[in-house]
Regions:
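Activation segment signature within eukaryotic-like protein kinase domains
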Residues: 131-132
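Short beta-strand micro-motifs within the conserved protein kinase catalytic domain, predominantly
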Residues: 85-102
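Protein kinase glycine-rich loop
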Residues: 29-35, 40
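Regulatory extensions appended to serine/threonine kinase catalytic cores
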Residues: 286-308
């Protein structure tokens, strides 16, 4: 997807009222986050629409133009309530410190990240099961397009406050095609949530995202990372063993998490299968509870040996 050039400089008085205006209508306000590749701002819609998120590259190099363009193309192709919606892209106009940098406009996920949620304390397993279902359904949609996120972690999963999609996946900056080879000398993802095969630099696989989501869910339920320590300690540990999953997490959860984080990627469920498993861990609605029996998690036959 090509990035259009800025059509104009800043509107008169724009900087006096606040931050730069991009795409002719979105005025940058608060800095929401900063990474090695980009900064993310909350922006007001001067045409009266809801606030949006604007991701601005750290510089105007060709590499960052390509990254923003690729991320925009990915988001524009996706349509799922648990994936942030693409709005537009362009180049920051002149007259500001950000001038000339490519930017991406997307839907603003209103709530805190699951990283912040994890720090505030443990959450009820029924709530986490609902989050898991929506997130795995979103991953199934992404994987169905032949793409892999590669950086599933609590900081990239945002609470939205909406019933239809309580959690949303953000930051598609390093998405890659399934089956593509690892880039020599280039690290992808976040060390503490990488699968063993991602850490070793194998071909890109959807199972990477499934494993990472398993570690996220385990962290939410236990309150601690599965593989703590330095980056090297964390990487080495996951190549030697599966994460410890306590048996005390509640009915169905230990088997579910062990399947998601199996050392052998072939023993992990697909994202679509995982969404179904998460749904069976959710409480039965009152109007469906015609018997005292609670739904039990059912796992694909090919993983019975792994879970035994």
């Amino acid at each position: 997807m090509s990035i259009p050039s800025p059509a104009h400089r800043q509107p008169p008085g724009a900087l006096a009222l606040g931050g730069p205006v991009v795409a002719g209508r979105y005025q940058l306000k608060d800095l929401l986050g900063r990474g090695t590749l980009a900064q993310v701002f909350r922006a007001a819609d001067l045409d009266g629409g809801p606030d949006v998120a604007v991701k601005v590259a750290v510089d105007d190099s060709a590499k960052h133009f390509e990254r923003i363009s690729n991320e925009a193309a990915v988001l524009a192709a996706l349509r799922h309530p648990s994936i942030v919606r693409f709005i537009g892209l362009g180049v920051v106009p002149g007259g500001t410190a950000l001038a000339g940098r490519p930017f991406l406009v997307e839907e603003l996920a209103l709530g805190p990240s699951l990283s912040e949620a994890a720090r505030t304390g443990r959450h009820h397993p029924d709530v986490i099961a609902g989050w898991a279902r929506g997130l795995f359904e979103a991953l199934a949609h992404l994987h169905g397009e032949g793409l892999v996120h590669r950086d599933i972690k609590p900081a990239n999963l945002m609470l939205s406050g909406l019933r239809r999609s309580p959690v949303r996946i953000v930051d598609f900056g390093i998405v890659a095609a399934a089956g593509s080879p690892a880039e020599p000398g280039v690290s992808s993802g976040t060390v503490h949530y990488m699968s063993p095969e991602q850490a070793s630099g194998g071909p890109v696989r959807p199972s990477w995202d499934v494993y990472a989501m398993g570690l996220v869910l385990l962290e939410l339920l236990t309150g601690s990372k599965a593989f703590p320590g330095t980056a090297i300690e964390s990487l080495v540990a996951r190549t030697l063993r599966s994460p410890h999953v306590p048996d005390s997490l509640g009915p169905g959860w230990p088997a579910f998490l062990r399947s998601l984080t199996a050392m052998d990627s072939a023993e992990r469920p697909t994202a679509a299968e995982a969404a179904g498993m998460a749904a069976r861990l959710m409480p039965v609605p009152v109007d469906e509870a015609t018997t005292p029996c609670r739904r039990m998690a059912v796992f694909p036959a090919r993983r019975i040996r792994q879970l035994a």
